[in-house]
């Protein structure tokens, strides 16, 4: 059952991050827990004026952009998947539930520079909203140890990598990429030509990359990296999105 939006809950947390140059910088951030149009939660970062998901529906956006436009386009029974931006773990949860139902084997790699605190994760309603009988799986995704493979189920192995994908070696033989960084105008360093070249090189022939973004500059950058790129209908509230194929 969906519910009405209430006053946002504000969480403050002190995050120590690596700039990539062996320096440590303490950043004080606020993340506001908000309810989107489909009843599912998202997080809002006031300092960036940016949401983790579409306010028109977090679950609907994730399902449309990554599951329907990406995962469902693969006929393979064994899938190697790379996500740029683990975030709230919503994409991972939807992928786990979808592939378990279809008896597929998934190795799920995901980069995240700013992992969420478990105390905040436990407030998110995805598990109870999407699959109440399997709600614990969502928490299991977040409790999984970083920087090593963890079998969440016999058919779903999660390998979360804490760090910057721009400065990291990417896993190889990838079939599907979920590109879910913050928007280009908020996090431009994540949409540079080098990252798309690295992604192209790590993917198998016929591999698919999907993202919610449909900006012309992003499409051109993907094409320059070697991808065949198409604009396809976007999720509720967004006319278009991009799908790229190697």
Outline where the language-model segments fall.
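A short acidic, Gly/Pro-enriched loop at the edge of an enzyme's catalytic core
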Residues: 168-176
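Glycine-rich SAM-binding Motif I of class I
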Residues: 89-93
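Conserved beta-strand signature within the Rossmann-like core of class I S-adenosyl-L-methionine
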Residues: 206-213
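S-adenosyl-L-methionine
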Residues: 124-168
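Conserved class I S-adenosyl-L-methionine
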Residues: 78-87
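Rossmann-like AdoMet
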Residues: 14-79, 97-126, 130
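A short glycine-rich, Lys/Arg-flanked "PGG" loop and its adjoining helix->strand segment in the class I
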Residues: 192-205
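Core SAM-dependent methyltransferase catalytic element
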Residues: 231-246
């Amino acid at each position: 059952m969906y519910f009405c939006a209430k006053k946002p809950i504000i969480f403050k947390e002190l995050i120590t991050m690596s700039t990539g140059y062996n320096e440590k910088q303490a950043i004080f951030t606020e993340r506001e827990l908000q309810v989107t149009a489909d009843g599912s939660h998202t997080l809002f970062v006031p300092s960036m004026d940016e949401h983790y998901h579409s306010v028109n529906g977090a679950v609907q956006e994730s399902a449309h952009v990554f599951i329907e436009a990406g995962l469902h386009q693969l006929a393979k029974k064994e899938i190697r998947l790379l996500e740029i931006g683990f975030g709230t773990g919503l994409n991972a949860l939807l992928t786990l539930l979808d592939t378990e139902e279809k008896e597929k084997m998934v190795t799920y790699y995901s980069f995240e520079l700013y992992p969420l605190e478990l105390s905040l994760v436990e407030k998110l309603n995805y598990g109870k909203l999407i699959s109440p009988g399997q709600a614990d799986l969502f928490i299991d995704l977040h409790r999984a140890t970083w920087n090593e493979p963890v079998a969440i189920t016999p058919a779903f192995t999660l390998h979360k990598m804490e760090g910057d994908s721009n400065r990291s070696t990417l896993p190889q033989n990838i079939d599907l990429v979920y590109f879910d960084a913050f928007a280009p105008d908020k996090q431009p360093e994540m949409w540079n030509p080098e990252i798309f070249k690295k992604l192209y090189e790590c993917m198998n022939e016929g591999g698919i990359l999907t993202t919610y973004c449909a900006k012309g500059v992003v499409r051109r950058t993907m094409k320059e990296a070697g991808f065949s790129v198409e604009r396809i209908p976007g999720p509720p509230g967004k006319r278009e999105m991009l799908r790229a194929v190697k």
